[in-house]
Amino acid sequence: MERCPSLGVTLYALVVVLGLRAAPAGGQHYLHIRPAPSDNLPLVDLIEHPDPIFDPKEKDLNETLLRSLLGGHYDPGFMATSPPEDRPGGGGGPAGGAEDLAELDQLLRQRPSGAMPSEIKGLEFSEGLAQGKKQRLSKKLRRKLQMWLWSQTFCPVLYAWNDLGSRFWPRYVKVGSCFSKRSCSVPEGMVCKPSKSVHLTVLRWRCQRRGGQRCGWIPIQYPIISECKCSC
C-alpha cells in the first residue's frame, strides 16, 4: 500500500527544493431517515422519500411557531427561512463554470489566520553552505518563506448555502466544504479534506404510519464541516 508522506516529510522536501534553487431502493424506511450526529467524514447527503404526501402543508409552516420550537438553536449566521441573497443562482444551482469561479473567489479571499503551525514556524531555511556552516536567512525573508508555505498548505472551509427542502426548517443552511481542486502539499500529492464537523439543530418534518399517518416537527442534529486539513 502506498503511504502518504507526513507533513514533516513534505516540509523537508520543500526545504531541499528551496535550498537547491537558492544554491547555485424504496420503502417505508424512508419515513424514519434523518441526519444523525456523527464524526464520520465526509458527510453524506440526505435521502428523502419523493412522495409529496409526506411534505408539510402550508398550515404546518407557521414561522412564529417553528421559531418558538427551535428556540435558542436558531443561528441567523448559518440558517435562513428564504433564499439568501448571496446564494449562487438564487433558487436553482449555478452553472458549473460560475460555481467554480465563485468557489475560487471565496478561496482567494481567505488567508491563513490564527497561530502558524509549529511545523512551519520551526523551519530553518538555509541559503547554502559556506565553509561548512549554514547561514541563516534574514528574519524578514524567513518570514516571507514561512507565510508562502503556510498559504500553500492552508485548507480553509468554504461555505455555501444549501437548500434542504420543505421538510426541514429553517430550509436553508450554510454548509462547509474543502477546496480539493489543487494539491496542498509540496511536492504535490496531498489535498484538503474534512477533518472536523459541528452540528446545527434544525427541525425536520417526520411522518409515521403507526395507527394512521401522523406527522410533526422534531429537532434533529444536522452536521456541517467545520475544519479542513491537508492529508492523503
From Swiss-Prot:
Disulfide bonds join C155-C192, C178-C228, C184-C230, C207-C215. Keywords: Chondrogenesis, Developmental protein, Differentiation, Disulfide bond, Glycoprotein, Secreted, Signal. Its main location: secreted. GO terms for molecular function: cytokine binding; protein homodimerization activity. Expressed in condensing cartilage and immature chondrocytes. Glycans are attached at N62. InterPro entries: Cystine-knot_cytokine, Noggin. One of its GO terms (biological process) is somite development. Disruption phenotype: Defects in Nog are the cause of a recessive lethal phenotype at birth. Multiple defects include a failure of neural tube closure, broad club-shaped limbs, loss of caudal vertebrae, a shortened body axis, and retention of a small vestigial tail. Residues 1-27 form the signal peptide. GO terms for cellular component: extracellular region; extracellular space; presynapse. Residues 77-99 are annotated as: Disordered. Pfam families: Noggin. Belongs to the noggin family. PANTHER family: BONE MORPHOGENETIC PROTEIN INHIBITOR, NOGGIN, NOGGIN. Essential for cartilage morphogenesis and joint formation. Inhibitor of bone morphogenetic proteins (BMP) signaling which is required for growth and patterning of the neural tube and somite. Inhibits chondrocyte differentiation through its interaction with GDF5 and, probably, GDF6. Homodimer. Interacts with GDF5; inhibits chondrocyte differentiation. This is Noggin.
